[in-house]
């Protein structure tokens, strides 16, 4: 591939994150009725009063994952967790030297790891720990495994589950990450002739086939039924969509915005103007949108607001050179 798919995906994720930060936690009606109206581009402010172009925990944890992958030339679960600790404790992978907007499940897992140094037990396993904190950071692992021609699909899914499980170790969260990987894989292996909806459907079908081979997955699969048929999901009215921090809401809203729009810009603006967990849903959608439309589809004025853009570009270039 001539383009840098790492940059396509990661910059899509980071721009989506930064676009959503200023309106995070707001209801759709609150956003629309602001003095400035709906989101049209990068803004400052928000719950954490950050400068325009600031990425949050989504971008930081994705960058931490990518940094570990580049440095180790593979997925090293222990090192990924160490990178998360550097983010939490030292503010690494942030633009201003301090982590913010940390999710409860991620924080709990990180401090459990700091105490016990055990990657097998640090992740949260209860059903109430199915937020979107592993889905938001899984993209670098997905790209790496989509490029891997040697590892079996079963082992790839296990790796994705293990990366999720560092913080979110319930099957529902791991399955969401597995379906996200399947969509990334479909995007990177499409011939470019099919629609985005059809490519994502191909990926979802592949993921569902994998999970359908084990009856122990059947109950959890029922939570993903809206993704089974994207033609039907595309017909869903916005009032019937939810865009909160629950992993099911996040992946549904991200895919819905992708298949009901025709550009990266339109997709991300649609996401953030839905309200609620705007930064994370936009990061999840942005990663896929970036892979489909390419980094050149991101408005230049949006990119211009991202401080430390060069750091992201350099890290993605290192990844590109390692996996040509």
Model-derived features: where do they sit?
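Structured, active/binding-site neighborhoods that engage oxygen-rich ligands
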Residues: 1-324
């Amino acid at each position: 591939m001539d383009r840098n798919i790492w940059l396509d995906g990661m910059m899509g994720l980071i721009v989506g994150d930064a676009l959503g930060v200023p309106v995070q936690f707001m209801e759709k009606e609150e956003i629309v009725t602001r003095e400035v109206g709906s989101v049209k581009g990068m803004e400052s402010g928000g719950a954490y009063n950050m400068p325009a172009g600031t990425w949050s925990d989504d971008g930081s944890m994705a960058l931490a994952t990518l940094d570990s992958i580049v440095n180790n030339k593979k997925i090293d679960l222990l090192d990924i967790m160490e990178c998360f600790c550097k983010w939490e404790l030292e503010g690494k992978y942030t633009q201003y030297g301090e982590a913010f907007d940390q999710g409860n499940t991620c924080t709990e897992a990180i401090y459990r790891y700091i105490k016990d140094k055990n990657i097998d037990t640090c992740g949260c396993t209860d059903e109430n720990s199915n937020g979107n904190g592993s889905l938001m950071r899984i993209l670098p692992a997905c790209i790496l495994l989509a490029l891997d021609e040697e590892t079996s699909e079963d082992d790839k899914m296990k790796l994705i589950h293990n990366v999720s499980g560092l913080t979110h170790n319930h099957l529902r969260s791991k399955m969401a990450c597995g379906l996200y990987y399947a969509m990334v894989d479909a995007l990177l292996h499409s011939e470019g002739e099919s629609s985005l909806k059809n490519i994502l459907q191909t990926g979802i079908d592949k993921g569902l086939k994998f999970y359908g081979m084990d009856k122990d997955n059947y109950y959890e699969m029922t939570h993903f039924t809206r993704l089974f048929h994207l033609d039907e999901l595309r017909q869903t009215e916005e009032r019937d969509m939810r865009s909160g921090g629950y992993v099911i809401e996040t992946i549904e809203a991200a895919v819905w915005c992708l298949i009901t729009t025709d550009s990266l810009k339109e997709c991300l603006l649609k996401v953030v103007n839905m309200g609620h967990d705007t930064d994370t849903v936009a990061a999840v959608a942005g990663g896929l949108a970036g892979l489909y439309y390419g980094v050149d589809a991101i408005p230049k004025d949006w990119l211009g607001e991202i401080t430390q853009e060069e750091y992201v570009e350099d890290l993605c270039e290192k990844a590109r050179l390692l996996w040509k």
